[in-house]
Swiss-Prot record:
InterPro entries: aa-tRNA-synt_IIb, aa-tRNA-synth_II, aa-tRNA-synth_II/BPL/LPL, Anticodon-bd, Anticodon-bd_dom_sf, Thr-tRNA-ligase_IIa, Thr/Ala-tRNA-synth_IIc_edit, ThrRS_anticodon. It comes from Gloeobacter violaceus (strain ATCC 29082 / PCC 7421). The gene is thrS. The keyword tRNA-binding applies. The keyword Nucleotide-binding applies. Binds 1 zinc ion per subunit. Catalyzes the attachment of threonine to tRNA(Thr) in a two-step reaction: L-threonine is first activated by ATP to form Thr-AMP and then transferred to the acceptor end of tRNA(Thr). Also edits incorrectly charged L-seryl-tRNA(Thr). PANTHER family: THREONINE--TRNA LIGASE, CHLOROPLASTIC_MITOCHONDRIAL 2, THREONINE-TRNA LIGASE. This is Threonine--tRNA ligase. Keywords: Aminoacyl-tRNA synthetase, ATP-binding, Cytoplasm, Ligase, Metal-binding, Nucleotide-binding, Protein biosynthesis, RNA-binding, tRNA-binding, Zinc. GO terms for biological process: threonyl-tRNA aminoacylation.
Length: 627
């Protein structure tokens, strides 16, 4: 399965160029109507942000005339502009720039578009001494008109669009956020620039709400909580983008894997295991080597004989391996569908600057499965996969705030393989299933994998951020490239259709999302440490251990805090570690065979003192409900 790591994560941004169907898409759903950050016209907000980036550059060149300008686009949640300046921007500089931007905005200056003859534009840029703009200009289509936008006595080479006047930009609805390094045109061999990031909104209230959510997002950052909860670490010696899972983190992974593995067995999946490397020929046959090579690690153990390229590569995907398992014997139509599943680790050669915590890594595990079905089985099996994914989301308390993105081919692009007919059949199958299931979906052209269209579930977390989670893909093309067959009822050899699916997607990224969604407060069934028993003094450690043994015998994850800390400190430590249930035991509890139950369930009072078996019944009830 082609699984794209980058998480669609935004506190506000809508999906661009959407085609909404069946009651709308996620950004127009009832759940979003009262979201202050979603009350803006996205096109208007884009113009405001783009124009604010121009105001930023105008202010910078007024305050620091030696600065050269490069590019300044609108981005999700704001804008940035890259500058070439001999000295670094300081926090004090940002305050001065922001003040100057407000002064400019309050002048209510028009932003006027002008078309300029090519030669005249070249002369202007040369006279200004703006080498970066000149380089951009020289790369423009010679037949296309060249335009600039003028604001007062300052102008920028730009195609737009922009607001008509700075009066449309509220002086208290934007803020400069930070300065970061950037290379000209993203090339490490080119000049290093300074990038100033900012955010802009229609109203001060929206800005305030955005900043509030960003502060909350910092508290929930999975990198911060991952360290505090002892789930994973990184090592410079191991390398960037390669997380190391600690015992608690590994246990969390195991819990998720076992949960899905057991459910898959109920639904007819068979577990397989495949190697981490393979001959490059495997990926040449699949097409990955030609369409995905830049994202793969380089060849290992290479040899060249008469110009032939040979060697091994670390796998970027699991599907070609599952195909080889299917192909190892001839199958009858009676055996189909065949559902092969694996928690397979794959490797992508991400650039170091693109790595980020668990959301963008170089080695990650995908809950990959590939179904080999007859054309007649495709619709039913696709719907069953969607049902499995929805079951997973419900079980993990992710709610119903999902929309479906139908990631289809851009027919004008050459990045895809396979025939038009194969693509049309696959896209039609996904569209029909989505309509039959009543999914709220939108079509995103150009988002398909290079060998097939897919349905991506888009999830909105507790902060209103959007993430891509589970994926289902229909594939007529790889069965053709690998010449897969089954024996039909009439004895003829026919091609199966493949369904690729991954409810979690990248397990690493999925865990990052869970950490941030729950702010580290995992549901009881999912928490690596479910219960911590706190003896009041050393005298009651033995009783605490006996309670732990009883819980462990019932396959609950329990620990005893046998430290010499006072009880208040033990309770605080348990709360900081976000252990769902704390059991306090002292003389009274030891004598009566009870425990004092403290719970972290929001809105639920502590259960008070209960007999051990009643406390166990309470825990088992919550575990059964996955709360």
């Amino acid at each position: 399965m082609t699984f794209r790591q980058p998480a669609r994560r935004t506190l506000s941004g809508r999906f661009g160029a959407l085609k909404c169907h069946n009651g709308g898409c996620s950004c127009d759903s009832k759940a979003m109507e009262n979201d202050i950050l979603r009350q803006s016209d996205p096109e208007k907000l884009h113009r405001i942000r783009h124009s604010t980036s121009h105001i930023l550059a105008m202010a910078v060149q007024k305050l620091f005339p030696e600065t050269k300008v490069t590019i300044g686009p609108a981005i999700e949640n704001g804008f940035y502009y890259d500058f070439d300046r001999p000295t670094p921007f300081t926090p004090e500089d940002l305050k001065k720039i922001e003040k100057e931007m407000r002064r400019i905005v309050q002048q209510k200056l028009p932003l006027v578009r002008e078309e300029v003859p090519r030669e005249a534009m070249r002369e202007r840029l040369e006279a200004l001494g703006e080498p970066y703009k000149l380089e951009l200009f020289e790369g423009f289509d010679h037949d296309a008109p060249v335009s600039l936008y003028r604001t007062g006595d300052w102008w920028d080479l730009c195609a737009g669009p922009h607001v008509e006047s700075t009066a449309e930009i509220h002086p208290n609805a934007f803020k400069l956020r930070s300065v970061a390094g950037a290379y000209w045109r993203g090339d490490e061999k080119r000049a290093q620039l300074q990038r100033i990031y900012g955010t802009a909104w229609e109203t001060p209230e929206q800005l305030e709400e955005f900043l509030r959510r960003e502060e909350e997002a910092k508290k929930r950052d999975h990198r911060k909580l991952g360290r505090e909860l002892g789930l994973f670490v990184f090592s410079d010696l191991v390398g960037p983008g390669l997380p190391l899972w600690t015992p608690k983190g590994a246990l969390l992974r195991y819990i998720l894997e076992e949960f899905l593995r057991k459910e898959q067995v109920k639904r007819g999946y068979q577990q397989v295991v495949t190697p981490h490397i393979a001959r490059v020929d495997l990926f040449k046959t699949s097409g990955h080597w030609f369409k995905y090579k830049d994202d793969m690690f380089p060849l290992m153990a290479t040899s060249e004989e008469e110009g032939a390229e040979e060697g091994f590569v670390m796998k970027p995907m699991n599907c070609p391996f599952h195909i080889q398992i299917y192909k190892s014997e001839l199958h009858s139509y009676r055996e189909l569908p065949i559902r092969l599943a694996e928690f397979g680790t794959v490797y992508r050669y991400e650039q170091s600057g693109e790595l980020g915590g668990l959301t963008r890594v170089r080695g990650f595990t995908v809950d990959d499965s590939h179904l080999f079905v007859t054309p007649e089985q495709l619709d039913d099996e696709f719907k069953k996969v969607v049902d499995l994914i929805q079951f997973v989301f419900r079980s993990l308390q992710l709610g119903d705030g999902f929309s479906a993105r139908l990631s289809f081919r851009d027919p004008t692009s050459d990045k895809y393989i396979g025939s038009d007919a194969a693509w049309e059949k696959a896209q039609a199958a996904i569209l029909k299933a989505s309509q039959d299931l009543g999914l709220k979906y939108f079509v995103a052209e150009g988002e398909a994998a290079f060998y097939g269209p897919k349905l991506d579930f888009i999830f909105r977390d507790a902060l209103g951020r959007e993430w891509q989670l589970g994926t289902v893909q229909v594939d007529y093309i790889l069965p053709e490239r690998f010449e897969l067959e089954y024996v039909a009822e009439d004895g003829s050899r026919r091609r199966p259709v493949m369904i690729h699916r991954a409810p979690f997607g990248s397990l690493e990224r999925f865990i990052a999302i869970l950490i941030e969604h729950f702010a580290g407060d995992f549901p009881l069934w999912l928490a690596p440490e479910q219960v911590r028993i706190l003896p009041v003094t050393d005298q009651f450690v033995g009783y605490a251990e006996s309670v732990k043994d009883r819980l462990v015998s019932l396959e609950m994850r329990a620990e005893v805090d046998a430290s010499s800390e006072r009880l208040g400190k033990k309770i605080r430590n348990g709360e900081t570690a976000k252990v769902p249930v704390l059991l306090v035991v002292g003389e009274s509890e030891a004598n009566s065979g009870t425990v004092a139950v403290r719970t972290r369930v929001e809105g639920e009072k502590d259960k008070g003192t209960l007999p051990v078996e009643e406390a166990i019944a309470y825990l088992q009830e919550r575990l059964a409900k996955r709360t």
